[in-house]
Amino acid sequence: MTIADNKKAFFDYFIEERYEAGMALEGWEVKAIRANRAQIKEGYVVIRNAELFLIGAHISPLQSASTHVHPDPVRTRKLLLHAEEIKKLIGKVEQRGYTLVPLNLHYTRGRVKCEIGLAKGKKQFDKRETEKDRDWQREKARLMREKA
């Protein structure tokens, strides 16, 4: 079940590979995510000391959160992957001009997971071409409905 999607990632990047990563979350974050208070549109993934971190994702705390916990909505969250996957990602990101972007948050067997994509940035003309294709598909569907 999908919690939050990053639709902007598909507009700004060519997604070449996808990986499912676990997330190191605090209790208040899990509660807030279950209440659909997560947003990853401005999030991005960085590599530090051979570890992956999700930066810029916003999880709004619930008002009923504990008084002794001071929630930070945009804190850096560690992503959990197998060592071989991390090494592979590090190699591609450092050498070939790829970047890592969060694609969505979802549940897998009751756990919150983040799907990250190995992506290459689109140029402005690529974005325009994608927009034209999308418009044509929409127009084609409309014409088919009118004929039927």
Curated annotation (Swiss-Prot):
Region of interest: Disordered: 124-148
InterPro entries in the cross-refs: SmpB, SsrA-bd_prot, SsrA-bd_prot_CS
Coiled coil: none
Keyword Oxidoreductase: no
Pfam families with a match to the protein in the record: SmpB
Record carries keyword Membrane: no
GO MF term set: RNA binding
Annotated GO CC locations: cytosol
GO biological-process terms attached to the record: trans-translation
UniProt xrefs under CDD domains: SmpB
Cellular localization per UniProt: Cytoplasm
Keyword field: Cytoplasm, RNA-binding
Similarity section: Belongs to the SmpB family.
PANTHER family: SSRA-BINDING PROTEIN, TMRNA-BINDING COMPONENT OF TRANS-TRANSLATION TAGGING COMPLEX
Role noted for this protein: Required for rescue of stalled ribosomes mediated by trans-translation. Binds to transfer-messenger RNA (tmRNA), required for stable association of tmRNA with ribosomes. tmRNA and SmpB together mimic tRNA shape, replacing the anticodon stem-loop with SmpB. tmRNA is encoded by the ssrA gene; the 2 termini fold to resemble tRNA(Ala) and it encodes a 'tag peptide', a short internal open reading frame. During trans-translation Ala-aminoacylated tmRNA acts like a tRNA, entering the A-site of stalled ribosomes, displacing the stalled mRNA.
Protein name (record): SsrA-binding protein
Organism: Ralstonia pickettii (strain 12J)
Taxonomic placement: Bacteria, Pseudomonadati, Pseudomonadota, Betaproteobacteria, Burkholderiales
Gene name in the database record: smpB
